[in-house]
Amino acid sequence: MQELNGIKIYDKLPEIVCPEHSCLVVWDVQNGLVNWIFNKDQFLNNLKVFIERIRGKMPIVYTLITPPSRNLTSAWHLFAQMRRFKVDDVNKLPSFMAAGSPEREIPETVKPHRDDLVLEKPSASIFFGTNFEYMMRSRRINTLVFTGIATEMGIESSARDAANRGFYPVVVEDCVSSMDKDAHERSVKTMAKLFIVEKAASLLENIDKK
């Protein structure tokens, strides 16, 4: 660790991912996405092991896609959904991640425990429209460890927003995934230049050095 004008700068991985000031984010790991990623079985196994090793050492926050009511959403959101589902009539948009639907559920093998936080959010950033930042500041969290789906969307946008707010963004390379393997790989390569991208085994080894 270095220090400048009273600011503590963590410059080694064990310091950065110290459990005392870190939080694990499990981003949008819901059946409606998990069932379409390119490496479903490997991803779920990697994530299960990682969560099991982390639990009890640092807080864990699960996010859930929570679409706004059709009557309270934006024109852009509706247009984007039309493109996503390839429909030319807004009235033909299917229900997506509706409350109580199987697609909204978190897979059994990685379900949250009682002490984990489940955060409903309306956008592709963990900070937008939520009280997540307030909770992290209150808990004096400096490092956010990102896992989940999709790499090039919510993971990358949340990591960028985290960095812009002064948090250390850490991405667990083998615990993030996407429906688009090429987009996933491009995003990982981009984030490795901007943030901290490490394999789960490396992170666990350094977390355990505390």
Indicate where each model-derived feature is located.
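Active-site-adjacent betaalpha module
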Residues: 1-23, 49-57, 81, 87-210
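Active-site loop/turn elements of alpha/beta-hydrolase fold enzymes
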Residues: 29, 65-67, 174
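Short acidic, Gly/Ser-rich segments with clustered Asp/Glu that frequently serve as metal-coordination loops
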Residues: 30-35
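…and closely analogous acidic/polar surface helices at protein-protein or active-site interfaces
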Residues: 37-53
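Glycine-rich, phosphate-binding/catalytic loops in enzymes
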Residues: 41-43, 78-79, 163
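Von Willebrand factor
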Residues: 53-73
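Aromatic- and acidic-residue-enriched segments that line the glycan-binding/catalytic groove
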Residues: 71-85
